[in-house]
Amino acid sequence: MEYLEDNKTETFEEEDKEREEDQVLDSDEVLDSNELNDMQECLSQTDLSNIDNNRAIQQLSLGSMEFPSYTTNSEKEEMLLGLADNFWHQYTHLYPDRKPLFMCPRNECGVEKFVCTTLHPTLLPYSDLYDWDQSAKFVSEYLTMEPLNPPLELPRSLFSSTSVLQKQSGNCFDFSVLLCSLLLGAGYDAYCVSGYATREMCLMDEKRNICPLLNKVEESSWEIPQKPLKKYTVKPPRQLISKFAVQQEAKKQAKMEEALRNEQEEETRLKEDAEKPGPDNLHGLRVHCWVLVLSGKREVPENFFIDALTGKSYATISEPFLGVESVWNHEDYWVNMQDCRNGCKDMKFDLGDPVCWEYLLQGGSKPLLLIPDEEDEEELNGETIQENKTIFQMPPSWVLPIVIRPKEFETRCPQGRKILQYKKAKHEKWAPYLKRDGHVSRLTGYLDTECTQEVKIQDCFQNRKDKLDLREQNKIEQVTTEYFIPGRADSLKVHEYRSLAPETERSMMFYSEARLDGLQRRDEKPVEMTEIYQGRADFLYYRHIVFGKRPKKVAIAGGPTEANPRPILKITERFNRNKEKPANEDVAERTFLLTEDRIQLRCHRKDDHITTSYWEFLKPANLGEKDTPIVLTPETCISYQVEPSEKFSKQLYVYETLVTLQQAEQNSKDNVRKSETEVREILATRAQEEADPQLTISIYDTERNEKSKEKREAMERAIQEERQRRAVQELDYLAPFLAQLGDPEKLTLWQAQKVKEDCLSDMKQRLIEKANLIQARFEKETQELQKKQQWYHQNQMSMSKEDEEAYLDYCSEAMFRIHILETRLNRHKDLAPQKYLALEDRLNKDPRLREPFLTS
Amino acid sequence: MSSLYDTMEPNVIDDDMLRNAVEEQGPKEEAGRIAKLEGIDFKHVSSLRLDFKNILKIDNLWQFHSLTKLQLDNNIIEKISGLDTLVHLVWLDLSFNNIEVIEGLKALTKLEDLSLYNNRISVVENMDTLSNLQVLSLGNNNLTSLENLIYLRKFKQLRTLSLAGNPLSEDDQYKLFIAAHLPNLAYLDFRLLNENIREMATMKYQYSIDDITHNENQEKRKQEEEEQKQRELDLHKAAYVENLNGPFLFESMYADDADGTKLSGLPGVAELMDSYRSKCIEICQNIFEYGMKQHEKREAEAFEFNECMQEAIRENQEQGAKKIQELTEKNSEILNELSQSGNQDFLDLKISQYIDDINKLLDSLMTLELQLVDQTEEIIKEYERNVSDMVSAFLETVQGLMAQVRDLENHHHEKLLEISINLLEKVLKGEMDDEITDDIRMIFVDKDTVINAVSASHDIHLLKIDNREDELVTKMNTWANNLIQKVQKDEIQRNRNRILEITTYIDHLRDELDNLELHEQM
C-alpha cells in the first residue's frame, strides 16, 4: 500500500524536502475501500500478464528470429548494455524513489536489447509516408492495439518493428517505436517518450472525443470588403430616425442576447458534465509511450507530441500527457529531471540542457545548451569536438530493415477492416476491393452517446464503375445525397433525393462543362421543375416549369408512363444579357402560360434606365395555320416600351415575333419532355447500378486486373510452349543411328555411308509397314463385308424389316470405311516415294554427313 | 442589253417602282398580307432588288437607310452615283450595266461583296475606303493592265476575285501574277488558288514582290511614326504645353525677327545667345513637365469624379429597379386575382389598393431621384471647386515661369544693347571694318538705328512670349468652363430622362389599370 501511495503522488522531485511536503499533503487523502479493491485487482493481474507475455514470445517463431542480431548481442551492444547497467545503478542509487527506467527490455528472442538500438530509421518508398501525419495515420491503422498489462508497469519486452508488423498488433511501445523509426527515416527530429498519460489515452478510448471527420472546416466568414472612401463618394441620404430609440433598442437586444447566451452556456456545461468520464483511481500512474517531434527539422515550427495509437498530434502542453520519464531516439537516451507535477505543461524539451535532461551517452548530435557568451562557445565547440572522438557511439540497430509490401500498405488494417468509436460517432474502414460494392469507409453519426439512434451515415466508395464517391444519408430528414466523380455518361455530380421514384422531390447537379446543354442543376418538386444552365450559346440560364395534374385517361394496360405525360402549365425561361443586342430587344425573361395561350416577354434593363420593356402576347387561335387570315387585335399584344420605337409597334413585327415565339414555345416544351425522360433514365440507371455495383480496375493494377492477368499468363504460357516446341524441334532425326555408332564426334566416310543407308532403309521399312497395315485393314474390312453379304443372302427371306435396315446401314458404313482405306492406301502409295526422296535429299544435305566434315 | 437600250426608254427610279419592288420582295404569305395592309416603311427595308428595270441613273434611294443588300444588275446604269446615303450596304450588285469608271463608292465602308461584272471598266480605282471588301467581281470588263491590280493589295480581307473575260486575263502570266501579288486571295475566277500555283508565282515574282513589300513596310512604318508623333502632340495639346519641350519657343522668337538674327552674328553675341538659349529651353522644359504632371492630375481627378458619379447613379438605379420589380410582381398577383374573382367589392378594394401602390411607387421613385440630384449636385460643386483650384494653381506657376523667361529676355536685351553700343563705337572708329558683314553695317550706322534694331527684336520676343502665355491661359480657362458646363448639362439631361421615364412608366401602369377596369365593366 505504501508503495502505491508513494507512486500515486510520485513526481520527480530531486529535493527530499519537497517530497516530504507532498507526502504530507497527500496523506490527507484517504483511500476508500473501493479504490483499494481496484488496486488489488490490478496487482493480481500483474502475474498473469507476465505469463501472457512470455507465451507470446514463445509463440512467435518468426523467420527473422533466426537472424543472428536477434538472438545474440554484438560486442558493442554488450558494452552498451554494460554502460546502461552502470547508468541504471547510479540512477537508482541517486533517485531511489523514482520508477525504474525503460532501458533494456528483452526482445522477441528473449535477448536484452538497449531501446535506442530498437529504432531503425527507415524511409519507405511511399510518398504518403513522407509526412508525419500520414505516417502516424498509417501506423495507427495498420496495427491493432493491445493494452499494456498491467497498466501501471513498463513492459518487460520490446519487440522489433519487423515482428510487430508481421503480427500487426502491439502495445503503445511497439506503436511508438515503429512510428518513430518511420519519422526518423523521413528526416524528422523524433523521439520515443516513455511516461504517463490518462486512462483514455492509454486505452485508446476515443468515445469522448468528437470524431475528427465530423469537425467540418468552418466556412471563413465572408466579409464584404469595405469600399474605400473616395473623394467624390456621395453622402448617404439622411436617415430620419431617433438616435435615442436606436440606442435603447440595441441595449435591449444586447440584454436578450446575453441572457440567451448564458442559458446556452449553462446547458452546454451541464451536458459536458454529464459526459465526463468517471474518476480514474489510477490517474497519473498509467504507463504510456508516445512520440515527440522537436522543431527544427523538416520545417516543423514547434515541438509536438504524436499519440501513435490514434495517430493524432497534440501540443506539448496537452492535458492527457501527465508525465515523462525518459526519451530516446536512435542515437541517445535522456532521462527527465524536471518536475512533472503539472503534467507536461512546464516541461522544457531542450535536450541539451543538462539540468533538465540527464543524458546517457552524449554521442548524439544534440547541441549542448547554448551559452550566450561567444568566447566560451568557441572553446566549448573545440572541446566537444575533441570529446566526441572519445565518446562511445551508439551501435547500429539490431532490427532488420522495415519492409512493407504495396499490398499490405494498401490493405492497411488487419483483415482489411477497422472500427473506431468516437463520441456519438462510429467510423468503419475497409480496404479497397474488400467489399463487393467498393465500400471503403462508413462514418455513422448518432444522436446519443450510447450510439443507438443513427442521425447521419456517410459512406465512401472507391473504384466504382458508376463513379459513386460518397453517399450521405440523413436519417432524420430521410434525405440521401450521393456525390459522383466526373466521368459518368450523364455527367451527374450530386444527387439528392428522398426516394428513387420519378416526379418526387429531388435535386441533381451536373458537371455542366461536360454536357452539351450546359445543365448545371435540376431541382424537382412534385409539380415543379427548375433547371439551371451555364455557358449556353443562347444565354439561357434558368428554366422553371410548373406541371398540372395528369388528366384522367383510360390507362392502356401495361402502357408506358410516357403515354400520358403531365400537362405543362407554365414555362419560365430566363436569359443572360447578350451584349450584341440592344437591351430593348434582348429578352431577359420569357414566360409561356400554356393553358391561357399567353406569352410574356420581359427585356433586360438598359444601363441608364430603371424600367424594363415588356410584352404580353395573347396567341390568336389560328396562329400557324395556313391560308387563314389572322386578326391582330390590340389585345394580341400589350406592351410597355422604355424607348418607344416605330419598329415595335408595327403589326408585322408583332406577327413575326408571335411566330418565332410559337416555335420557341414548342422547343421549350420538347426540352421539358426530354428533361423528364432524362430524369427517368437516370433514376433507372442508378437503380440498376445500385442493384449490381461494379468496380473498375486500373490497367496498372497487375494483381486485380483479370484481363491483364490472363493476358500476362497467356503470354507466359505461350513462351513456355514456344520453348518446348523448340526443344522438340531440336530432336535429331539422326540421333538413333548415331547412337548405334556410339555418338562419335565426327563420322568417318564409312560411318556416314552406313548412317545414310540405315536411315534410308529404316524409312523404307516404315513406309512399307504402313502400307501393309493399311492393306491389312482394307482386306479385313472387305472380308467382313463379304461375310455379312453372304449371311444376308442366306437369311434374306426370314429377316424382319429392322434387321434389313440394320444390314443396309452396316453395308453403307462398311463401304465408306473401305473406300477411305482405299484412298489412304493410294495416297500412301503416291506419297511414299516422295517422302523417301525427301529424306534422301535431306541426308545428302545434312552437314554432318557431308564430305568436308568427315574424318577420313 | 445593248439591243434593248436602243429600243426601250430608260426608266427612272420612282416611288411606284420602289413600292412595287419592296412589296414584291417583302414578307410572304400571311406576314406579307399584314405588311401590305400596314404598309412597309422604306426605312426598315434591309434588302432591295431592282434588276431588269432599264434604269439609267441610280436615284431616290436615300430613304432606304438600313439597306444592307442592293441589287441593280441588268440595267443600263452608266455612272455610279446616289449611293452615298446607303452607308450600311454590305452587298452591292451592279453587274450587267454600262459603267465605265469605278466611283461614288466612298461612303460604303461596310461593303463586303461588290459585283461589277460585265461593265466597261478599264481601271481599278477609287475604292480606298472599302477596307472590308471580301468578294470582288470584275469579270467581262475592259481591264488591260496587270500592274493596275497591285491596287487590290490594299484589301486585306479580299478572298474571292473574278477577272475572267478581261483583256488582261488572256495574258499567260495572269494567274501567276495575281497569285504572287495578292497573297490573301483564296479564289480566283471561282477556283481555289492552290499551294503549287502560289509557290510558282512567288518564285517567279520574287523580286518585284520583295520590292513592293519593302515599300509597303516602309510606308507603314512612316505612317506609324507619324501617328505616334501626332498622338504625342495631341497629348501635349491636351495638357496645353505643346511645343514647350524643346527650343520651339526660342526658335519662334527669332523666326520673325530679322534684326535679331542679324545681331546674333555680332562678335561676342554668340556666347550670349547660347546661354540665353539653353536657359530659355530649360525653363520651357520646366513648364512642359509641370504641365504634363498637372494634366495627369486633372485626368485622375476627372476619372475619380466620373467613377464616383457613375457609382452613385448605378446604386440609385438599382434601388429604383428593385422597387419597380417588387411592384411588378405584386401587380401580376393582383391582376391574377382580379381576373379570377367576380366579387365587385373585392375588385374595387383591390383596384384602389393597386392605385395606392402605384402612387407609392411614384413617390418613392421621385424621392430617389431627388436624393440623387442632391447628392450629385454636391459632388459636382466640389469637383468644380477642385478643378478651378487646380487650374488657377497651374496658371500661377506657369505665369511665374513665363515671367522668368521674360526676365531672361530683358537680361539678354540689356547685354545685347551693351555689346551693340560698344561695337558701334568700334565701328564708328573703323576698327571693325573687316569683321562685320554688310548686313550689320547697315544697322550700325548710328546709335538710334542700333538701339531701334535691338529694341525691335526685343519687342518681338516679348510679344511671342506673351502670346504663348495668353494662348495657354485662355485655353485652360475655356477647358475648365466647358468641363463644368458639360458635367452639369449631362446631369440635367440625365435627370430629365429619368423623370420622363418614371412618368411614362407610371402613366403606362395607370393606363393599363384603366383599360382593365373598362374591360371589366364591359
Curated annotation (Swiss-Prot), chain A:
Q: Which GO terms describe its cellular component?
A: cytoplasm; cytoskeleton; motile cilium
Region annotation (Disordered) maps to 1-30, 255-277
Its localization reads: Cell projection, Cilium, Flagellum; Cytoplasm, Cytoskeleton, Cilium axoneme; Cytoplasm, Cytoskeleton, Flagellum axoneme
Could you list this entry's UniProt keywords, alphabetically sorted: Cell projection, Cilium, Coiled coil, Cytoplasm, Cytoskeleton, Differentiation, Flagellum, Spermatogenesis
**Compositional bias per record (Acidic residues), positions renumbered to this chain:** 12-30
Report the superkingdom from the record. Answer: Eukaryota
- Provide the coiled-coil residue spans: 245-276, 661-733, 764-790
Q: Name one GO biological process term.
A: sperm axoneme assembly
Chief location: other
Biased composition, class Basic and acidic residues, residue ranges: 1-11
Q: Which family does it belong to?
A: Belongs to the DRC7 family.
Per UniProt, subunit arrangement is: Component of the nexin-dynein regulatory complex (N-DRC).
Please give the function described in this protein's UniProt entry: Component of the nexin-dynein regulatory complex (N-DRC) a key regulator of ciliary/flagellar motility which maintains the alignment and integrity of the distal axoneme and regulates microtubule sliding in motile axonemes. Involved in the regulation of flagellar motility. Essential for male fertility, sperm head morphogenesis and sperm flagellum formation.
Q: What is this protein called?
A: Dynein regulatory complex subunit 7
Annotated source species: Xenopus tropicalis
Underlying gene: drc7
